[in-house]
From Swiss-Prot:
This is Ras-related protein Rab-25. Mg(2+) binds at T26, T44, D67. It is found in: Cell membrane; Cell projection, Pseudopodium membrane; Cytoplasmic vesicle. It catalyses: GTP + H2O = GDP + phosphate + H(+). Its cofactor is Mg(2+).
Amino acid sequence: MGNRTEEDYNFVFKVVLIGESGVGKTNLLSRFTRNEFSHDSRTTIGVEFSTRTVMLGTAAIKAQIWDTAGLERYRAITSAYYRGAVGALLVFDLTKHQTYAVVERWLKELYDHAEATIVVMLVGNKSDLHQAREVPTEEARMFAENNGLLFLETSALDSTNVELAFETVLKEIFTKVSKQRQNSTRTNAIALGSAQAGQEPGAGQKRACCISL
């Protein structure tokens, strides 16, 4: 997956980062978009987003990654935060089981606010802290499989799987979008074919136009 200038792109995909405060969402964002890591552990206040344009085949995708704090007092922003999102990384801290124990609640909140077709990846962050692990890989992987989620373990500190996590989500979104466009094109072709087969041309052409919008 290659880089491209921010002004030159074919699609914009909004991806949200969700999960408890302190799991490393902000550092995943900064590692992916700016290749930076901050050891300052202050909690993110409010909402921020960063962008990075990447190539998927011949298509330029502008990934708009949104980040917010996981504290209860900021939950009032959820509707606007999730609006328009086509992808989500649900992040927990591998070294703190309590952050994993609430991923189901975060998943419910996501589905309450976002489209049902949103692509979701469960991300176990801080994989570099091997000795402090509290969440077994297979336990998290099984939860992801049972809930139809993608799954990866990452380390924003040493960059392990950060690129792969975002790339996998973006590819899955792009695949869905491509299929929708193909289905729309196929539907238009059928409508136009019906018009040519004997329907009133004006009506058939109008129907195809409406379907494609």
